[in-house]
Amino acid sequence: MTQTFDPSAFLATCSGRPGVYRMFDAEATLLYVGKAKNLKKRLASYFRKTGHAPKTGALVSRIAQIETTITGNETEALLLEQTLIKEWRPPYNILLRDDKSYPYVFLSDGNYPRLSIHRGAKKAKGRYFGPYPSAGAIRESLSLLQKTFQVRQCEDSYFKNRTRPCLQYQIKRCKGPCVGLVEPEVYAEDVRHSVMFLEGRSNALSDELNATMEKAAMALDFERAAELRDQVALLRRVQDQQSMDGATGDVDVVAAFVNPGGACVHLISVRGGRVLGSKNFFPQVGIEEEVGEVMSAFLAQYFLGGIDRELPGEVIVNVINDDFPAFVDAVEELRGVEMVISHRVRGTRARWQQMAVTNAEQALTARLANRQHVASRFEALAKVLGLEDPPMRLECYDISHSSGEATVASCVVFGPEGPIKSDYRRFNIEGVTAGDDYAAMHQALTRRYSRIKAGEGKLPDVLLVDGGKGQMSMARDVLNELQVPDLILLGVAKGTTRKAGFETLYLNDAAHEFTLPGDSPALHLIQQIRDEAHRFAITGHRARRGKTRRTSTLEGVAGVGPTRRRDLLKHFGGLQELSRASIDEIAKAPGISKKLAESIYANLHSE
């Protein structure tokens, strides 16, 4: 591919029809994907001599080739553009980082249905409510329902194997259907009330509960009346918090806000007239820094990005864009949903719109302030380390285990804008003496920097090791063994009091020992990164330890692989319950023969 690009020659043969264009640099790297109603006019605008934003100028300076694809109309161009952006994620495009399916509340079938969080395909029989904008929003609803109507939320395998009520019953979060402490018709009524709440019929539910409460009081059933009174009080509290309610239907309210430091899109989800929650998105802003372009890119990626989201009939936005008609047509063509985009709204919808705008502005302001705060800490650390410029990349390692069991090493990465979580790594440590933190750290660093030397990953400017002189010396040995280019090695050890603010630091070699004042921004950054490495190591260790304890006793049984182990534990509700089962009971589990049941039983009772 040639490194020079002649815009005049290219535009002379460029079509004026709708389509998609792709810009490449001299190394054939895709830089940007765009769409246009008129390809020739749109592409010509890039090569005007004046009026470009800095990022557009940077893009144009790197163009070595442009490829175009003509489409039948703008809608086809939009769909193709989104497909290419999702596949290639070009650096100059606006990119939406969040790519997870959105959660629903799932109500299972059966005599004693269960409420739970669900993501992914809707295969299980039951009812789905949502989608909710975040897991936090859905947990709030489930917590309220658990307090108010005490519908169970435990796994079916756990429910089927209970012989006495669990802690949830003791704290009045469940009525104990697992051991027959509630009549089926009473439980069914609680489920019906939960459904009314999830459908957004809170007012009708409150009226019904009030009427039932009055009847109970008239019948002198004061205990039941008090229970209903508490339920009504909880519902009213939620209704007060959801003061934005007051309309019907399914609506997403989307507000975009842009300033020179970045962009934020705030989304509020309304289903059945009830606000389910909200979420902030911080898209990677490409060359389009106008708020309308950010909004257009967000809507296309969010609603057409390949995730099977349940689409609302209306989207309220705070800014309009010429691409919206093509977007609406694309939604109908691809998803079969007739969607309306509203901009000028009144009443309740206007309040939703304004709240979304306010939240977008505040979220971006807070994010940029935090980014500036972290950057100032990096500058302070640079002074401590004697660097002319702040380091751009810090890595920190920590080890977690329980008396040598399930040892896990963590690696967290920070930059001037904060944690770079996509670069976090965990290492399951094998083949070292139980409890030998030095050997565990040696293995983790060797594995990590061997990969970096092989071209997998980036070398940090500063390597932060949570430990004293011993860990520092070991880390230096690893770097020397692998001939890793010079980088700054910084060790942090707790002081004699083991309190925050009294840490001892070691720079490059264990002989260079110093401390920092408790109010030092550089020390605060070191503490933040160390604590994050500690957290990441502990969560990994707990997950590994839990998995080991759940499955290790079955791993030696011939014919019991990972899938069968999982199904067995799910059928019996856990390893403890499986251990109590007889051979005949084990043989009744799906896919388990009498002979295999005997082997499983013998393995569980071998000691």
Swiss-Prot record:
<keyword id="KW-0267">Excision nuclease</keyword>
<keyword id="KW-0234">DNA repair</keyword>
<dbReference type="InterPro" id="IPR010994">
    <property type="entry name" value="RuvA_2-like"/>
</dbReference>
<protein>
    <recommendedName>
        <fullName>UvrABC system protein C</fullName>
    </recommendedName>
</protein>
<keyword id="KW-0963">Cytoplasm</keyword>
<dbReference type="InterPro" id="IPR038476">
    <property type="entry name" value="UvrC_RNase_H_dom_sf"/>
</dbReference>
<dbReference type="GO" id="GO:0009380">
    <property type="term" value="C:excinuclease repair complex"/>
</dbReference>
<dbReference type="GO" id="GO:0006289">
    <property type="term" value="P:nucleotide-excision repair"/>
</dbReference>
<dbReference type="InterPro" id="IPR050066">
    <property type="entry name" value="UvrABC_protein_C"/>
</dbReference>
<dbReference type="InterPro" id="IPR047296">
    <property type="entry name" value="GIY-YIG_UvrC_Cho"/>
</dbReference>
<comment type="similarity">
    <text>Belongs to the UvrC family.</text>
</comment>
<dbReference type="GO" id="GO:0003677">
    <property type="term" value="F:DNA binding"/>
</dbReference>
<dbReference type="InterPro" id="IPR035901">
    <property type="entry name" value="GIY-YIG_endonuc_sf"/>
</dbReference>
<feature type="domain" description="GIY-YIG">
    <location>
        <begin position="16"/>
        <end position="94"/>
    </location>
</feature>
<keyword id="KW-0227">DNA damage</keyword>
<dbReference type="Pfam" id="PF14520">
    <property type="entry name" value="HHH_5"/>
</dbReference>
<feature type="domain" description="UVR">
    <location>
        <begin position="203"/>
        <end position="238"/>
    </location>
</feature>
<keyword id="KW-0228">DNA excision</keyword>
<dbReference type="Pfam" id="PF01541">
    <property type="entry name" value="GIY-YIG"/>
</dbReference>
<comment type="function">
    <text>The UvrABC repair system catalyzes the recognition and processing of DNA lesions. UvrC both incises the 5' and 3' sides of the lesion. The N-terminal half is responsible for the 3' incision and the C-terminal half is responsible for the 5' incision.</text>
</comment>
<dbReference type="InterPro" id="IPR000305">
    <property type="entry name" value="GIY-YIG_endonuc"/>
</dbReference>
<dbReference type="InterPro" id="IPR004791">
    <property type="entry name" value="UvrC"/>
</dbReference>
<dbReference type="InterPro" id="IPR036876">
    <property type="entry name" value="UVR_dom_sf"/>
</dbReference>
<dbReference type="GO" id="GO:0009432">
    <property type="term" value="P:SOS response"/>
</dbReference>
<dbReference type="Pfam" id="PF22920">
    <property type="entry name" value="UvrC_RNaseH"/>
</dbReference>
<dbReference type="GO" id="GO:0005737">
    <property type="term" value="C:cytoplasm"/>
</dbReference>
<comment type="subunit">
    <text>Interacts with UvrB in an incision complex.</text>
</comment>
<dbReference type="InterPro" id="IPR001162">
    <property type="entry name" value="UvrC_RNase_H_dom"/>
</dbReference>
<dbReference type="GO" id="GO:0009381">
    <property type="term" value="F:excinuclease ABC activity"/>
</dbReference>
<dbReference type="Pfam" id="PF08459">
    <property type="entry name" value="UvrC_RNaseH_dom"/>
</dbReference>
<dbReference type="InterPro" id="IPR001943">
    <property type="entry name" value="UVR_dom"/>
</dbReference>
<dbReference type="Pfam" id="PF02151">
    <property type="entry name" value="UVR"/>
</dbReference>
<dbReference type="InterPro" id="IPR003583">
    <property type="entry name" value="Hlx-hairpin-Hlx_DNA-bd_motif"/>
</dbReference>
<keyword id="KW-0742">SOS response</keyword>
